[in-house]
Amino acid sequence: MKAIKIAIDGPASSGKSTVAKIIAKNLGYTYLDTGAMYRSATYIALTHGYTGKEVALILEELEKNPISFKKAKDGSQLVFLGDEDVTLAIRQNDVTNNVSWVSALPEIREELVHQQRRIAQAGGIIMDGRDIGTVVLPDAELKIFLVASVEERAERRYKENLEKGIESDFETLKEEIAARDYKDSHRKVSPLKAAEDALIFDTTGVSIDGVVQFIQEKAEKIVDMS
């Protein structure tokens, strides 16, 4: 059976990572969390106090402490920078609020996209992000673009933060998500937009299982036809 490449794009908190992980597990595919890679680069910048003018230093740190993914005993995915487990650190609000400017740096995107394409070559992979279908994997057999209202996405992020023990204010989250949408869709390098051949799916009011079922059915149909 042919193993395909699946690209899932969409704005912040549209449910990309959640459904991508479930589908990867169901299909026996590899899940590559591209967002975690950009968050890791952002974590480096914030930890060292680097600005956009010091991109060479961020890249140097990435080379010294490469990003890797490992599985925890419970099957969840852990993110490492070198030997440091940054799984929780890269989900903190300061990283979330700064990832847009770091991910907009051409040199950072070039390096991480190169790594992502190399990993995806063999197929049987599912990636989620903001430019997977348009830039990273333009040859992906299945491209999905998930959308949802700002209100719904803020609610998801609020619940997610509660589960992780991260304090947050709902109204502030709404403002941050709206601001992130604007930054991501107006940046010069790889702006957030659906690929021309992507299936656009509004997840507002749709359960996780409903989104998973929709994408899996599309994937299985492509595999059956190949």
UniProtKB/Swiss-Prot annotation:
GO terms for molecular function: ATP binding; CMP kinase activity; dCMP kinase activity. ATP binds at G10, P11, A12, S13, S14, G15, K16, S17, T18. Gene3D superfamilies: P-loop containing nucleotide triphosphate hydrolases. One of its GO terms (biological process) is nucleobase-containing small molecule interconversion. Its EC number is 2.7.4.25. It is found in: Cytoplasm. The keyword Aminoacyl-tRNA synthetase does not apply. It catalyses: CMP + ATP = CDP + ADP; dCMP + ATP = dCDP + ADP. GO terms for cellular component: cytosol. It holds the Pfam family Cytidylate_kin. InterPro entries: Cytidylate_kin, Cytidylate_kinase_dom, P-loop_NTPase. Keywords: ATP-binding, Cytoplasm, Kinase, Nucleotide-binding, Transferase. PANTHER family: CYTIDYLATE KINASE (PTHR21299:SF2), CYTIDYLATE KINASE/PANTOATE-BETA-ALANINE LIGASE (PTHR21299). This is Cytidylate kinase. It comes from Streptococcus pyogenes serotype M49 (strain NZ131). The gene is cmk.
